[in-house]
Curated annotation (Swiss-Prot):
Functional description taken from the UniProt entry: Inhibitor of lipoprotein binding to the low density lipoprotein (LDL) receptor, LDL receptor-related protein, and very low density lipoprotein (VLDL) receptor. Associates with high density lipoproteins (HDL) and the triacylglycerol-rich lipoproteins in the plasma and makes up about 10% of the protein of the VLDL and 2% of that of HDL. Appears to interfere directly with fatty acid uptake and is also the major plasma inhibitor of cholesteryl ester transfer protein (CETP). Binds free fatty acids and reduces their intracellular esterification.
Lineage, opening ranks: Eukaryota, Metazoa, Chordata, Craniata, Vertebrata
Protein name in the entry: Apolipoprotein C-I
Similarity section: Belongs to the apolipoprotein C1 family.
UniProt entry keywords in alphabetical sequence: Lipid transport, Secreted, Signal, Transport, VLDL
Pfam families assigned: ApoC-I
Gene Ontology BP, a term: negative regulation of very-low-density lipoprotein particle clearance
Organism: Arctocephalus gazella (Antarctic fur seal)
GO molecular function: fatty acid binding; phospholipase inhibitor activity
Subcellular localization, as worded in the UniProt entry: Secreted
Amino acid sequence: MRLFLSLPVLVVVLAMVLEGPAPAQAAPEISSTLERIPDKLKEFGNTLENKARAAIESIKQSDLPAKTRNWFSETFNKVKEQLKTTFS
């Protein structure tokens, strides 16, 4: 009984696959795709620029750079003092 039902389903699926894509799903022409490449690249560049600017502004406004700088300064001074006391 299962084989009797699965064969027609298999035939219908095979027919749909062999039919190919519908006209609305067909790939666009190469020339139209090539014409849109500069616009897409410009849009990508603008988006990337905006995101980079936003990230840089976020970093500038955060306390992370100042905290990092202070930590490095403190650590460097501690190491310098330890070296002075060790080799003096």
